[in-house]
């Protein structure tokens, strides 16, 4: 009898891509396994539509994509902001139940598990109705997962974790070798209006799962992974990464060709690449400071500059209609020989290009893994979610990044921040990132981690073997 896994990713690009690419990996490693991915639709544009279309136009054998029916946005638009994503799946429970029910009645296939995004862990209730074991996918790193479990434990012990907000406290967290400053804690965990109680309930449910699968690898986060394994109250941990979409996200191939063609004309390791994720937009005054810092640094650059979503709209904006309206007067003319300002960027292809020598990043976990895979050192500019923590880990724990700002925080929903990073600091850190010293410790560590990341995914590598053990658990 053939085995079937059901995957349920959250409808955001950083969550969906990782799970779909993981499904492809599972299928490639086990010939008797099929995967069905259930994709929920979110009322806002989360950058997944083009990727979703590419899955349907370029099907993978034994991988089935099921788009769940769209539901009325009013079902969750009025929810507290921390509960918006989890509430998406609440509106889909009937559909998910019907799908699982039909699949479990098949005489030719056995449903061996449901792999749910951490945000969708409450779907476990439906899986339990059919005696289907639930596995959890953590789209962020092991360090973050350990922190979340630690804060949840403190919360269970009646400690008010919101007291850490805006404090100078340094926390001793089992998944970090260094004390963690309160200023880098994800705001969603320490903000009373951010729904920390609800989020901790999700991590509480995670402890009931069969296992937790993390997109990381032993050599990158050995301390964090070991701490999770040592905790008897946490399910078995399987690091199976880095799992990346190396073929792009289905965006415009013509634009990609122009961008890569420009990079072809640049000297090796000479270009600093600036990209801040799908929601990585800035107010005009900050854009001008970045531009001045770039120009003063004297380095070649490729800058992915994207506007925020206009008020009242839900669609992501890929580029500005007129760059001269947002950039300093004359900037484009003065830098035309050394720089290129674009909208959307084919990030993995850019990072993998030999002309790119540094990456100014928002430190989303997928971007972190991509920079490691490509061996490109990072200057950290975290903005929301767990990105401040990722930046801290990259700079202090792993030594593979330089710090521009670790605690720069942006309101994910209002997209405003009164704090400005000045051109002088941007100039200084870009110069530090791009300095032409072959023995640079950061550059050396990144190159070593690049080799380790690839070895981890190769036969008998740490992630390769971890996935083999996971198959033993599942099958």
Curated annotation (Swiss-Prot):
Top-level taxonomic group: Eukaryota
Record-listed UDP-alpha-D-glucose binding positions: 345, 347, 362, 365-367, 370, 386-387
Active-site feature positions: 15 (proton acceptor), 117 (charge relay)
InterPro entries: UDP-glycosyltransf_plant (IPR050481), UDP_glucos_trans (IPR002213), UDP_glycos_trans_CS (IPR035595)
GO terms classed as biological process: terpenoid biosynthetic process
PROSITE patterns (UniProt xref): UDPGT (PS00375)
Result after altering residue 144 to Y: Loss of glycosylase activity toward protopanaxatriol (PPT)
Keywords: Glycosyltransferase, Isoprene biosynthesis, Transferase
Record carries keyword Zinc-finger: no
E.C. no: 2.4.1.363
Binding site for an anthocyanidin: 15, 385
GO molecular function: UDP-glucosyltransferase activity
Catalytic activity: (20S)-protopanaxadiol + UDP-alpha-D-glucose = (20S)-ginsenoside C-K + UDP + H(+); (20S)-ginsenoside Rg3 + UDP-alpha-D-glucose = (20S)-ginsenoside Rd + UDP + H(+); (20S)-ginsenoside Rh2 + UDP-alpha-D-glucose = (20S)-ginsenoside F2 + UDP + H(+); (20S)-protopanaxatriol + UDP-alpha-D-glucose = (20S)-ginsenoside F1 + UDP + H(+)
Expressing tissues: Mostly expressed in leaves and flowers, and, to a lower extent, in roots and stems.
Enzyme class: transferase
Pathway: Secondary metabolite biosynthesis; terpenoid biosynthesis
Coiled-coil stretches noted in the UniProt entry, renumbered to this chain: none
Site residues (Essential for the glycosylation activity toward the C20-OH of protopanaxatriol (PPT)), renumbered to this chain: 144
Annotated function: Component of the dammarane-type triterpene saponins (e.g. ginsenosides or panaxosides) biosynthetic pathway. Glycosyltransferase that catalyzes the biosynthesis of ginsenoside F1 from protopanaxatriol (PPT). Triggers C20-OH glycosylation of ginsenoside Rg3 to produce ginsenoside Rd. Mediates the conversion of protopanaxadiol (PPD) to the ginsenoside compound K. catalyzes the production of 20S-O-beta-(D-glucosyl)-dammarenediol II form dammarenediol II (DM).
Record-stated family: Belongs to the UDP-glycosyltransferase family.
Entry protein name: UDP-glycosyltransferase 1
